Regions:
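Short, acidic, metal-binding catalytic loop of nucleotide-sugar glycosyltransferases
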Residues: 25-34
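A conserved acidic beta->alpha catalytic loop
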Residues: 26, 41-50, 66, 94
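Glycine-rich, basic loop-to-helix element that forms the pyrophosphate-binding segment
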Residues: 64-81, 91, 102
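Short aromatic/hydrophobic "clamp" motif used to bind/position activated sugar donors
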Residues: 86
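Conserved donor NDP-sugar-binding/catalytic core segment of glycosyltransferases
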Residues: 93-130
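Short, flexible, basic/aromatic active-site loop/helix in glycosyltransferases
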Residues: 135-156
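A short, conserved alpha-helix in the catalytic core of glycosyltransferases
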Residues: 156-174, 179-212
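Non-catalytic, C-terminal membrane-associated alpha-helical segments of glycosyltransferases
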Residues: 244-308
Length: 308
């Protein structure tokens, strides 16, 4: 049962005790006293859960019995959250004390699903990559990037570890799709589902958080597997989400190019990613069937948001 006016903070963490030691005090300082904080310990081996129990007994800790990765850990934490608004933060994010002041007013609009935060470089205070993400369809695939313009409120996607959202809409959309395991594209997919279902994604540059970008995935997977998972999930993103006949035809036309030239350029990684994605095609189509009942906005209209 959701509790009106309660804010829940969910922080997934794997072997991130050193990051929580650094950033958790700022998280607690920035939240209203009535907020609840949930840390999902993703089967860490660094004593995270015991450290939290000793130093922050009021924080709820979800202890995964095995390593479930980012998406599933977030889903578990959000399912436990009682607040109407959930703030999802990576363990390497350090929010400014007043960052929520410019975020919460956006949720007075019931059509707003999520609000993204303005990420800044923690060293000199200059914006590194911001928090506003856009996308375009090119060469048969959906590519994503962060534009130089980090002041415009319109966005196509937000970072899953640096945003707040309406839990009721999250539940309706189904949360992070585990189709995109073990990592990558789940946050972009969820934002896409929200936009296609008629909801709004907002970027709020005044909501400042410092993001240290200490990549757990790089340590876990290495660069080759990261490229493999990213390409696999890029294909699955198209197969699950794109409904425009023109874009789907374009995807088929460009596939031979990618299967030959992109495979050569990536030293075989794309071909492996394609076959891995193909194995998951039935799952992607099942997921597509589930979410497509909510779709009311065309792909073309979503891509236009990148031009605003």
């Amino acid at each position: 049962m959701l509790v009106p006016n309660l804010i829940s903070v969910v922080i997934p963490s794997y072997n991130g005790k050193h990051l929580l030691e650094k950033n958790l005090p700022a998280v607690l300082k920035s939240m209203p006293s009535s907020s609840e904080v949930i840390v999902v310990d993703d089967f860490s081996t660094d004593g995270t859960a015991d450290w939290l129990a000793k130093n922050y007994p009021h924080i709820k800790v979800v202890r995964n019995s095995k390593n479930l990765r980012f998406g599933r850990s977030c889903n578990l934490g959000v399912n436990m959250a009682k607040g109407e608004i959930v703030v999802l933060l990576n363990n390497d994010v350090n929010p400014h004390s007043d960052f929520l002041l410019s975020v919460l007013p956006h949720f007075k609009d019931n059509q707003v699903f999520a609000v993204g935060f303005g990420e800044i470089n923690s060293v000199d205070g200059e914006i590194v990559s911001g928090g506003r993400g856009v996308s375009k369809f090119e060469r048969g695939l959906v590519t994503h990037w962060r534009p130089k313009d980090q002041k415009t409120s319109s966005a196509i996607w937000l970072s899953g570890g640096s945003m707040a959202f309406n839990k009721g809409i999250w539940n309706k959309l189904g949360g992070f799709d585990e189709l995109f395991r073990p990592a990558y594209e789940e946050d972009r997919d969820l934002c896409w589902q929200a936009l296609k279902s008629g909801y709004k994604i907002v970027f709020e540059p005044k909501a400042i958080v410092e993001h240290f970008h200490e990549s757990t995935n790089l340590k876990l997977f290495g660069k080759t597997k990261i490229s493999l998972y990213s390409l696999k999930n890029q294909l699955l993103f198209v197969w699950k989400n794109i409904s425009s006949p023109w874009y789907l035809l374009n995807h088929l036309v460009w596939l031979p190019y990618h299967l030959i030239l992109t495979t050569i350029r990536t030293k075989g990684i794309f071909l492996t990613a394609f076959f891995w994605a193909l194995i998951q095609l039935p799952e992607a189509l099942k997921s597509r069937s589930r979410v497509s009942r909510l779709w009311i906005v065309k792909d073309e209209e979503i891509f236009k948001l990148a031009e605003k």
